[in-house]
Design a protein with these regions (language model features):
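Metallo-beta-lactamase
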Residues: 37, 93-214, 220-221
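Terminal amphipathic helices with adjacent charged low-complexity linkers/tails
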Residues: 211-240
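Conserved beta-strand hairpin/beta-sheet module of binuclear metal-dependent hydrolase folds
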Residues: 1-57, 143-146, 150-154, 246
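Active-site environment of divalent metal-dependent phosphoester hydrolases
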Residues: 11, 47, 72-77, 99-102, ...
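Active-site neighborhood of phospho(di)ester-bond hydrolases with catalytic His/Asp-centered motifs
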Residues: 40-42, 63-72, 92-96, 152-155, ...
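A short, charged/proline- and glycine-enriched loop
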Residues: 240-246
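Active-site metal-binding motif and surrounding structural segment of the metallo-beta-lactamase
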Residues: 36, 46-93
Length: 250
């Protein structure tokens, strides 16, 4: 299992509205499953040449068998169109919603496999289980759990715009900066969808997970996994919620 992402340490504004004082990463992962090659996520199109070099270090880019697309924002799926030039045979697995978006984005034919919630897919010697988590933070989003490795690929959940060249959370050496980036990212990306985040946490907190492969920022390992999930639950729990609709007439 390999990290093949992009480090964007000079980025200071993301999606026009988010400040990224610590830069960010666009995380992508390669899994070799016996005789099959599986790619999770891609990178922004502007970084494609650098991204291609990263991939070529570990795989033959002409022989990608599957691409798992967690969600179709350009920072996750921006290189799909160009990758199809190298591996037109690769099968793209995503939610039906994501495949619909992707067809409009790449504007070309590809082999799409619509995943189903809680469905298991055996690829080579690995088993993938898909968990639909709509509105985290797009309607097309899903997580993927690699059962043999106990790795959870989580798209935008549990991530941060925090550039860490060493990639893994054990390398974090400035906890205050990381916590600042983690909370700000949550507030901007996940915060508007708290009920959906709580539903996702109910599904994953009890799982045996050795690694959380985020879309941005450090890959979470060890105690960091449960600590970040605990923070997400605290932040997503609304105190004294009012379930009734209220209209104020001045």
């Amino acid at each position: 299992f390999y990290w093949t992402g992009i480090i964007d340490d000079k980025l200071r504004v993301f999606d026009i509205i988010m400040y990224t004082e610590f830069g960010t990463t666009y995380n992508s992962y390669v899994m070799k499953a016996g005789d099959k090659t599986v790619l999770f996520e891609t990178a922004k199109a502007k970084f494609f040449d650098e991204y291609l070099e990263k991939l070529q270090e570990v795989i033959d880019v002409h022989k990608i068998d599957y691409l798992i697309v967690s969600h179709t924002e350009p920072d996750h799926a921006g290189s799909v169109e160009k990758l199809l030039d190298y591996s037109p045979q690769m099968k793209i697995v995503a939610t039906g919603c994501a495949l619909g978006f992707l067809k409009e984005i790449v504007n070309r034919d590809f082999v799409g496999i619509p995943a189903r919630d809680e469905e298991k897919m055996v690829i080579g010697n690995r088993t993938l289980r898909f968990l639909f988590v709509p509105n985290l933070h797009w309607p097309d989003t899903m997580y993927t759990f690699i059962e043999e490795e106990q790795i959870l690929v989580t798209c935008d959940s549990f991530g941060s715009h925090y550039c860490l060249p060493e990639v893994v959370s054990t390398a974090i050496n400035n906890e205050d900066d990381y916590q600042k980036a983690l909370k700000y990212y949550y507030d901007c990306i996940i915060g508007p969808f708290k009920p959906f985040m709580l539903k996702a946490l109910d599904r994953v907190e009890g799982m045996d997970i050795t690694m959380v492969c985020t879309g941005h920022g450090p890959v979470l390992v060890g105690d960091r996994i449960k600590s970040v999930m605990k923070q997400y639950r605290e932040w997503s729990t609304v105190v004294n919620p009012n379930p009734r609709k209220t209209v104020i007439i001045p």
